[in-house]
Amino acid sequence: MTSSVRNGSPSPSPALPSTTTPAEQESRNAMTMANNPGDWDSSESRPQSLSNGKGIGNGMVANGHQKPSTSSTAASANNASAKDPLRPRRKKAKRACFACQRAHLTCGDERPCQRCIKRGLQDTCHDGVRKKAKYLHDAPNEALIPGIRGNLYNQAQAARNKVNSNSQQRNGTNSNSDNNSTNTNSNNKPSHQDVSTNFFSTPSANNYHNVYTQAKSRQSQHMPSRVMQDATMNPSAFQAQPPASPTFDLSSNPQNHTLSPSIAQNSGTTPSSSASQNPDPYGSTFFDPSHPALFNFDIASMNFGNRYGALEFGMLGHLATGAGDTPPSDTATRRGSIGRSSGTFTVQNFGEGSSNQSPFLFGGDPVLNDWNPAGQGPTNPRNIYNQNSVSGQMTDHPHAFAIESAPMNFASPTSTESPQMTTVTQFDDPSVNFSSRTTLMPPTNTQHQQQPQPPRISTPSLKNMQVGVKRRYRSPSSIYESVKEPYSYTSGFHSLTAFIQRRFSPQKTLQIAKALASIRPSFIATTKTLNQDDLIFMEKCFQRTLWEYEDFIDACGTPTIVCRRTGEIAAVGKEFSILTGWKKEVLLGKEPNLNVNTGGSSSSGVSSRGSSTYNSRNSATTTVMDNQSLPAGRTQPVFLAELLDDDSVIEFYEDFAKLAFGDSRGSVMTTCKLLKYKTKEDGVGLFRNSNGEVSAGGGDTDANDSAGAGVGDGTTTAVNGVSNGSSNNATNVNANGNVNVIPNDLSGASSMKSSPKQAWGKSRIAGEAGMNQLGFRDGKVECSYCWTVKRDVFDIPMLIVMNFLPCI
């Protein structure tokens, strides 16, 4: 490009040829705007030909000749102001429009931006598309739509735009060489004031639900023709629902809200008219992301007792399943869950349904299991998105991103139904009639009255599953109302110390005392700052945790016990009672503990092979004496040390000292010997030691003598009124239901022959009767057990959970 100077004034450049390159066009625009400094706006960037110093500036024309002094002064002042370090910095836009992105120029947050308005491109100004990251490669385009925060109404920005538009119209900004063509174009396009009015109209409370609809309509209406050919920018890819559903409403008439203008036309209403019938449920808040209806969360239908837990569960499911929102696969059904396949929708949910239809995704049924009208015909489970229901508006795309469109796998069965696992074939066969076993849409009130509810499909849950007899619902609120005072752990430790001193020898007592003494400083450090309220809260935490464990213990078939940190039994499963013979009432201290089986120990510490007498706290007299020292209204549960033999007790407390304040997630897996529950009636005739003397504790007995009848000085022992020397065998049925046959023959061999119960072998264990025979000879059941310590909020050991499996 050349220019000449005649008579002190620059002559206009010759006309450019019709085929100009983009660089020449940009240079020409830059030269034109350099002659009109008033055209520059603070929100628009200079052309690159000026900013990089290679174009026109500092009074030089394109060919390097000097310009007149007046023009040189204006250009120099303008260029100096642009390099002023104190000039206000332009705010970086969150996302540039398509035109500014192609030109690599700074854009603004408003739409249309100032640069597109000055160039007459306001009708095609829209957000540019960024290159997808690798982790978003499989995400649909609608999930990548920028948030509505950038498109919200900004009153201050709109006022500035209006002032700028008025000043531009007064000053006449279109003074370039293409003035005529621009004026011709402007006749067919709205003015800047009209654009500002259309794009930044005040969003009243009546159109809060149409945010994404307006954004999508602007993108589809003002998209250039060249972009329409691009598959990645095709607005048809944005026809699916945005991440947040625009149909939420908590008003009394939610059916008037529409999904899009096309649906509104089908239903005979318009977005503005339908929205104006309902007030804004949020008041002054235009967009409340914490509201549950934003993500189609129906709090009432979720199986939660509180709002915050349901919201947290819903958001976790929303994050887990809402990113890709791909059609459901067979893996969802193999897990026993319908998954997103249950989220079938029709047009009735978006504006033209009856008043009985619920606007939420999950419907009005609080159990989350009824999803289809009961009278509906055969349904194809693969056609879950209703591709022809909304005439192309929702083709192959579900409604919003919901929490797996009904967490069927987390729904707990009620007390009137039995848990059943759904097979895969029920979902894979399109000809199967779903109405015979479940429903996919919330049925209307009329359908509820006409037809009974079909059985619901659900995955077995351990929380509220029906075990044995019908269970009544328990509320944890009773725990917080009933606990009024802290638990006296001091009395528990005193009782434990007294029991250990009575049962164990001094040497074994010292080993247990050393283990407990090692954790005593930690107990003191963690409890010295606790007051009365903290101790009450600690007991509430214990009872609340125990409330959860009781349900799992009842549903689990493993022998399990739960005890406090003092070793007092707090919960027990029926399998443990079957294995050991200890009744639940006895373990919890509700019935007297009459056990005499201590694994061979005695009060004096002498082995059971000696001729010592048994004097245990477990006798009826001793139990009454111990209970007299307990606080009023408190019973004394059985200690864990009473259930194990001597070596197992010592090993347990040594491991407990390491785990109590050590690894909070640690566990111990080892072997032990559980003591069977034996009273005097059971034990005297069942056990004798190797010397032929009666041993109530059972002691360490030989194989040949372990099952023989009790022998004192050569005479048989009478049981239940059976006289000595009787020729008939005496049969004793103890409190546990065990039948003990006491033969007249004193030999162990004849005893084995005459007692069918004692003839059980390990290969013939079957049912409860077989479990009762474990440890029948010596009163000990060899087990492998695993236990762990659970701490409370003060990091103090709260309870011990133990699982046992017998070694057979």
Curated annotation (Swiss-Prot):
Residue numbers spanned by region Disordered: 1-90, 158-203, 236-285, 322-387, 442-461, 598-629
DNA-binding region: 97-125
InterPro entries tied to this protein: ERT1_acuK_gluconeogen_tf (IPR050335), PAS_13 (IPR056751), Zn2-C6_fun-type_DNA-bd_sf (IPR036864), Zn2Cys6_DnaBD (IPR001138)
One annotated GO molecular function: zinc ion binding
Compositionally biased region (Low complexity): 69-83, 171-188, 442-451, 598-619
A Pfam family annotated for this UniProt entry: PAS_13
Polar residues bias (residue ranges): 158-170, 189-203, 248-279, 339-359, 377-387, 620-629
Main subcellular location: nucleus
Organism domain of life: Eukaryota
Swiss-Prot/TrEMBL GO biological process terms: cellular response to starvation; gluconeogenesis
Alphabetical list of CDD domains matching this protein: GAL4
Keywords: Activator, DNA-binding, Gluconeogenesis, Metal-binding, Nucleus, Transcription, Transcription regulation, Zinc
Record GO cellular component, one term: nucleus
Localization (cell): Nucleus
Keyword Calcium: no
Family statement: Belongs to the ERT1/acuK family.
Known function: Transcription factor which regulates nonfermentable carbon utilization. Activator of gluconeogenetic genes.
Record protein name field: Transcription activator of gluconeogenesis PAAG_01030
Organism: Paracoccidioides lutzii (strain ATCC MYA-826 / Pb01)
